[in-house]
Amino acid sequence: MHWDLFCRVIDNFGDIGVCWRLAADLGARGESVCLWVDDASALAWMAPLGAPGVQVVGWDAEAGPGDVVIEAFGCDPPPAFVAAMAQREPRPLWINLEYLSAEAYVKRSHGLRSPQMAVPGRGLDKWFFYPGFEPGTGGLLREPGLMDERHRFDGRAWLQQRGLAPQPGERVVSLFCYPNAPVDELLHALATTPTLLLTAGTALVAPRPGVLRCLALPWLSQSDYDRLLWSCDLNFVRGEDSFVRAQWAGAPFVWQIYPQHDGAHAAKLDAFLALMLGGAEPALADALRRLWHAWNGLRSGPAAPPPAAPWQALARDWRDRLLAQPDLVTQLLGFVAERR
C-alpha cells in the first residue's frame, strides 16, 4: 500500500522524530511511504541515510493521495489534498495519529470514527489512533528485531569507540531535557558519586570540579541515540520519542514531560507513573514520584534518586510488560486491514 504521512514541526523536533520512526518502520515492512513535512531540516542529522521505501516531500508538494493518509497529531493536511481524498475511488483511509498518553481517555477514544461533514472532506471518515501502554490502545513504536539488537549490544565498547569511555567506577548518565529543567539541582545530586554525564541535543552543562565529568554530544541520529540510551546506567529524557526509546533501553530513566500552560501535563505525568509503578515496592514508588515531580517542577526541594538495583529491576520489569503487547505498526497495519 501507499501511505501519506503528514507532519508539522512545532518545536523541539519531537513530532518529526515520531513521524520518521513510523515512516521508516512502515518502509522496512514493505510499505511505500510519502512523508509530508513542513521543515525537514532535522532529518539531516536524525536520519542522514534515509530509509528504504520512504520519500520526503515538502508540505506544498503536488501529489495525489494514496491508500492511507495519516495526519500526525491533528496537523490538518492541506485542503486541496483533502479534497482530492474525497474524490478518489476507492477513498483512502484517513487516520489521525494522536499524542501518547497513559490517561484513561485513550482506551475510550482509540479507534473511534469521526464522519466529516464539512468541505473539503465531506463524506470522508477520520479514524482516531491512540498510542498507549496498555491493551486496548495502539501500543508503542518498536521495530522488529529491536530487542534482539539491544540484547547483543555492548554499551561500553560503543562508548569506547566514540571516545566516551567511563573511568573505573563511574556511572554513565545521559541528559536530554528542556531549558526549564532544574539542571543545577541534578548536578548537585549526581556529584555525590563518580559520574560521567553525557548531554545530548541542546542541554549545556558547565564543567564542574570533583567526581562529576560532563561531556557535550552533538545531535545524534536516531539509531545512535538509541545506542546512547542502551549504554547508560540512567537516562534523563524529554517529550515523546526519547521517552519511548528509554523504555526499550530497559535502564532507569526520568522523563521530563512537555509542559502545557494549563498544567494538564501534571495529570498526564501521574497517569504514567501510576501504570509503571503499579505493584512496585512502596518506598521505591514514593522515591520515584518525588524525583519525577521535582524534575518536572511539580514540587520544590531536592529529590535524590533511589538505589540503583531496585530501580533497574523495575525498569526491566516495565519493559517486559510493554513487550507483551503488539507494537504500534503491527497494530496499525491490522487496523487498516480491518477497515479497507
Regions found by a protein language model. Name each.
Residues 98-181:
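A nucleotide-sugar donor-handling region in carbohydrate enzymes
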Residues 191-218:
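Catalytic donor nucleotide-activated moiety binding site of glycosyltransferases and closely related
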